[in-house]
């Protein structure tokens, strides 16, 4: 449902931010 989509989106954002930090 919508909640699953939101959670998936937040996880994607969190992973992207984490990867950006680790690459620095």
Swiss-Prot record:
Top-level lineage group: Eukaryota
Tissue: Is synthesized in the stomach and stored in a novel granular multinucleated cell in the gastric mucosa. It is stored as active, processed peptides in large granules within the granular gland secretions of the skin.
Protein known as: Antimicrobial peptide PGQ
A GO cellular component annotation in the UniProt record: extracellular region
Family: Belongs to the gastrin/cholecystokinin family. Magainin subfamily.
Cellular localisation: Secreted
Keywords linked to the UniProt accession: Amphibian defense peptide, Antibiotic, Antimicrobial, Secreted
Main location, first listed in the record: secreted
Function: Antimicrobial peptide.
Originating gene: pgq
GO biological process: defense response to bacterium
Organism of derivation: Xenopus laevis
């Amino acid at each position: 449902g919508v909640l699953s989509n939101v959670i998936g989106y937040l996880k994607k954002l969190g992973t992207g931010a984490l990867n950006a930090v680790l690459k620095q």
